[in-house]
């Protein structure tokens, strides 16, 4: 009896910051593995999300948003991670936002033109476009920019047409053995996912007040006798004022962040979690490549 053919390939999700790449990845996978926030530049590592359906396995690379400014070491590294993701994939999903077109979009497009992989153009947030009459000319403009494999208007938030993207992806996966067991959804460790969950809550509850100079280090991640996990998270900020902001009045802010992060961790790890958080000032970490290496920002470049 002949063996069933299997199909497997890597797909990069690219675009300028804050167009909805992480939301799209989470929808394609059916659960949350990439942090989402209304702030630009929330994805700092290339998260690999794995979706296996029967004989098809799609491995998604969620890049940081490519962007023009490269002043700080962390932004240079994020751009490098995004650019290197484009080079070694079977397919690219280029995410843009509604009828907006910016120099950053243009820069991403230029990088894609240099590549060999076919590109699906996903026009996100079309449900937010007020004047629908603007949409058709904009679609025609985008279609003339490059020979796209397909152009799909989507809403990553509501899931509109995300199944269309998934179907196109499946159709273009090469015949290959599956790289991961079928129950895997990410190759990232639980420790890494714990730090991402804490960072998402920081973004969510501190919003515009908090600059990007914040990161999370998991100092302890152990199983306990109750069948759950004891996790200690260290939140690193650059200035004393930021530390006070994270802690909040009488510790209220960090308590909320801890409670919400613990809930998400318990959902993800399917086990009880005991979480403790500390805040520490480590000035200049976002400018120091050595510090970034020690925090794991360049282990995947």
From Swiss-Prot:
Pfam family, one: KH_2
Era-type G domain location: 7-175
Region (G3): 62-65
PANTHER family: GTPASE ERA, GTPASE ERA, MITOCHONDRIAL
A GO term from the CC aspect: plasma membrane
Transmembrane segment boundaries: none
Gene name for this UniProt entry: era
GO annotation terms (biological process): ribosomal small subunit assembly
Subcellular location: Cytoplasm; Cell inner membrane
The protein, known as: GTPase Era
Family assignment from sequence similarity: Belongs to the TRAFAC class TrmE-Era-EngA-EngB-Septin-like GTPase superfamily. Era GTPase family.
Renumbered residue ranges of the record's region G1: 15-22
Residue ranges, annotated region (G5): 154-156
